[in-house]
């Protein structure tokens, strides 16, 4: 695997010759619209090298044992880590191990039903890269009844045909926004909780879902225990069906906080089959220009989360979108990562890379107004997958599958094994 960051004077022809990869392959894998490129653009160049694994040294580790574990020669590990003393490995030290044993994870992609042809086309193209399909098409009434917002039958049917397990995503959405009042009213009332549990189980079974994915956001902190009661009741009723729960990111438990206070990570993890921590929107819509998922913050979230959630149950979220912000108003437009990349090319804006957050960004002007764009590229995605490997997490989630992210999917296909079970 190679990543080429474009410099002044580079051309696709020059890069193609350098790596021995056809220009059209580079264009396709990176989603380019022409042969024009700009400084700072990161290009993913596929090759036949072994995938790199990321490993944290533990007590008792020695090079020859690691070589056996990862099916590689000791000299390969030593060559991949210049500067380390193979006879004095430090506990907690991170090393790179080229290995034929790929990282194996369970992936989940969120999809909002739109046109059947577009949804099915997306599923067809990503069939081998998804374990679960989370269908975002359900909300709840004031009385707790879950209901369908749009037709999802074709998506569910196609996902089964492609060996992707469909999950019913239910949200506390009212009038287009997440409603704390709505979910609070339902969770606090035993009858409404019962309505919600029964309707979710019935819908999941009737519509042939393999389980339910809960996405209740801004639950009032006072309803923390009610949420646990609901999840326990729901899991009991679901039986062998999957209970997947999405949780807001945090680095400490603050029970009174209006955004994260209602979510008792440890208690939820004891009930749910899979827990997805939404490691996104550090840089949020309407806020100042910031990376959406800075790697240093993501690692802090993971480290806290693993004190509460077993690593075998935990997924982290990878954004497939960027934010285009007008400065200084911070008016924000969400755009797919591919659109963000190609907008930099079309405006001629050199792409910068922040080494602390491990995220790309650029600045451009339109109609006299300054725009700052943060997004993800192959470099930031690689860093995120390193965290999954380093902390031995269950896998990843992606918001949202309609956002093209060819670099991410190409890397996943070439370097990672997606578990189908």
Predicted segment positions?
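Primarily a LysM-type cell-wall glycan-binding module
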Residues: 1-20, 41-43, 47-71
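Intrinsically disordered, low-complexity Ser/Thr-rich linker and spacer segments
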Residues: 42-56, 65, 86, 93-116, ...
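Glycan-recognition patch characteristic of GH18 chitinases/ENGases
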Residues: 100-196
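Hydrophobic faces of well-ordered beta-strands that scaffold small-molecule active sites
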Residues: 107-111, 131-135, 166-170, 212-214, ...
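Catalytic domains of carbohydrate-active enzymes, especially glycoside hydrolases
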Residues: 116-141, 199-212, 384-396
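Substrate-binding surface in catalytic domains of secreted glycosidases
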Residues: 143-150, 224-225, 229, 233-345
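Glycan-binding loop/region signatures in secreted carbohydrate-active enzymes
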Residues: 172-178, 182-183, 320-384, 414-421
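Active-site groove signature of glycoside hydrolases
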Residues: 195-226, 274-288
